[in-house]
């Protein structure tokens, strides 16, 4: 007996996104968004995962593209699910670079403490909720060492094991 009928859409409208919490000298990196629902709001940087791109590489790429900062994905902090989009929220380690706006997707880069960010009216609701949780618990799911035999560390990662 078949319980569910599923027909694969010819063109998927589902998106996979990433964003991240990056601390530099005790302050969190934010950008001021220039378009869409978050226009003129501050949020933690992120963006969409490209075809065949690992989410860890996507968040590192997005941070570099948007802020000129090189960072390394450390842990999965949280995951947001919507019917049309999934977003993985990472914690990241700072590697190098001076934070600056890309002048396109964002108009400003800010470094704020968690309390400074939470006190602002211009922060997105999602970033606010992530920070509220982060203030209470900074621990996420770390990347494991296991790599499937048919894969390499460049195209495989498992978290929490």
Question: For each of these PLM feature ranges, what is it?
Answer:
Residues 107-161:
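Nudix hydrolase/Nudix homology domain
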Residues 23-28, 37-38, 50, 69, ...:
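Short, charged/polar surface micro-motifs in flexible loops or helix N-caps
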Residues 1-19:
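Acidic, metal-coordinating catalytic segment for phosphate/diphosphate chemistry
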Residues 69-78:
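A short coil-to-beta-strand element that immediately follows conserved catalytic motifs
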Residues 12-14, 82-84, 103-106:
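A generic structural micro-feature
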Residues 24-61, 65, 158-161:
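Conserved Nudix-box catalytic region and its N-terminal flanking loop in Nudix hydrolases
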Residues 80-100, 110-116, 130-138:
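Active-site-adjacent beta-strand/loop module that shapes the phosphate/pyrophosphate-binding cleft
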């Amino acid at each position: 007996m078949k319980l569910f009928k599923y027909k694969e859409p010819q063109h998927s409208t589902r998106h996979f996104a990433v964003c991240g919490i990056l601390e530099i000298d005790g302050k969190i990196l934010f950008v001021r968004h220039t378009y869409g629902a978050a226009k003129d709001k501050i949020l933690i940087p992120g963006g969409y995962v490209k075809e065949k791109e690992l989410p860890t590489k996507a968040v590192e790429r997005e941070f570099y593209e948007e802020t000129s900062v090189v960072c390394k994905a450390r842990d999965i902090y949280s995951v947001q699910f919507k019917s049309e989009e999934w977003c993985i929220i990472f914690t990241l380690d700072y590697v190098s670079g001076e934070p600056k706006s890309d002048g396109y997707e964002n108009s400003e880069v800010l470094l704020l403490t968690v309390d400074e960010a939470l006190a602002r009216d211009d922060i997105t609701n999602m970033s606010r909720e992530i920070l509220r949780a982060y203030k209470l618990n900074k621990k996420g799911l770390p990347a494991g060492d296991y790599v499937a035999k048919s894969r390499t560390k460049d195209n495989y990662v498992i978290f929490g094991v």
